[in-house]
Amino acid sequence: MTEPLISGTVYPIQMLDKKGNNMTKQALVPVANGSEEMEAVTIIDVLRRAGVAVTVASVSDSKDLKITASRGTYIVADCSIHDCAGKAWDLIALPGGVPGSQHLAESTVLDQLLQTHVKELRLLGAICAAPAVILGEKGLLADKTATCHPQFYQSMKAKEVDTESRVVVDGNCVTSQGPGTAIDFALELVEQLCGVVKREEVASPMVLTTSPTAYY
């Protein structure tokens, strides 16, 4: 039986300035065994629709880049998180899932990347368990209003926990609640990274609706 594989290896055409410098936005999406697949794949897909160069990195110490997501879906990363060490990213976006979020939190390489990323005021996104288990526990939400999966409302260490909003933007930090808000979250990342026009351009062919009655 063939294993179902989701691999992210198609990159957008590079955008170069007049001096030949690469202007394509660069995003890092770390994944681990137990990451939430709907969130991970939605983030990757929507960002790539916007022309963002997305690198999917496994935090596993294994040389095998295949991870098993929270519902048994196999995802093949582009590289190991060790290959990303010391690089600057326009965006780091963290999918949730349990125990995936905990595995991401335990990665020393990812921790170093996150600490530098936050100090440089670069765009940071986290959804579901990730805001609480990763960002909150590392003290990266101490001055932020944020949201997360309802299961973690009481334990999330943030300046303020927003339990009403599907997506919360506070400065350079974007957080969201879970699988059902993943598209909203990913589109907000597109808007923050590439502008509202690009968000609308990406959203239009996705046949999105905000009205439940539209389905009946």
Segments predicted by a language model, with ranges:
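Extreme N-terminal basic, low-complexity initiation segments
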Residues: T2-I6
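Short, Lys/Arg-enriched N-terminal segments with co-localized hydrophobic residues
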Residues: G8-N22
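Active-site-adjacent pocket-lining segments in enzyme domains
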Residues: T24-E36, V46-V59, D78-C79, C84-Y216
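N-terminal beta-loop-helix "entrance" segment that forms/cooperates
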Residues: S60-D78
